[in-house]
Design a protein with these regions (language model features):
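Conserved alpha/beta-domain cores
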Residues: 65-214
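Acidic, glycine-rich flexible loop/linker segments
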Residues: 1-107, 115-120
Length: 214
């Protein structure tokens, strides 16, 4: 991506999935997404922020194998400060649920929307498929809660920007074009807006379903 850093969504999701990701590539008004052509061979030093033209064989080394998360065999002391993890992908809950943490401090809902649902919530309502959102959200939360039980899981309800909601199927019809989407119609200001409240209720129904049925 041209913008972003170690804590942006692209970085977080890529780390969870174990895939390479280069963010924040804009330099001196040049953007990598436009400067680097399709099929062009380059070497990227992501640690130092350097891009070399062509393949530099002397600096290209095979990546070390990634080790899976395991439970430490030694005694884990109880700390005065609770240790929580962030998790976006429900399919990774079992893998990381075995770690000696106190629970999930932040489970982002957005990953479920973009990876499993793909459609704007208001579009689902208009087409009579509200249950798709409710059931898919609930199933994602169930996986995480089940893997971490009886530890606490904190779910953050959707916090997409209008530009991100617009990328979902049907989103063009419902989303405004804002000069600064980062500071625009998102979060709580969206939840209680009459134009979006029906969609917000789908998220609440999913939470209710998890608590009552699972």
């Amino acid at each position: 991506t041209d913008a972003g850093g170690m804590t942006c969504h692209a970085s977080i999701v890529s780390r969870e999935l174990g895939i390479p990701c280069i963010v924040g590539t804009k330099s001196r008004s040049h953007e990598a997404t436009t400067s680097i052509k399709e099929g062009q061979m380059i070497t990227v030093d992501a640690t130092n922020g350097i891009v070399y033209d062509g393949v530099l064989e002397d600096v290209v080394k095979p990546a070390a194998p990634q080790e899976q998360a395991v439970v430490a065999s030694e005694y884990i002391p109880v700390t005065g400060t609770k240790i929580y993890m962030n998790l976006g992908d429900p399919d990774l809950a079992e893998k990381y649920g075995v770690l000696p943490c106190d629970g999930i401090g932040l489970m982002r809902e957005e990953f479920i929307w973009t990876t499993f649902i793909h459609e704007h919530p208001l579009h689902l309502i208009e087409t009579g498929r509200s249950d798709v959102a409710v059931n898919t959200l609930a199933e994602g939360m169930r996986k995480v809660c089940q893997a971490l039980a009886p530890r606490q899981v904190v779910v953050r309800l959707s916090d997409f920007k209008s530009s991100e909601y617009r990328d979902l199927k049907g989103g063009d019809k419902y989303e405004p074009h804002e000069s600064s989407a980062l500071l625009g119609w998102r979060g709580a200001s969206r939840y209680y807006d009459p134009k979006y409240t029906p969609a917000f209720k789908l998220e609440l129904e999913a939470i209710k379903k998890v608590r009552n049925e699972f």
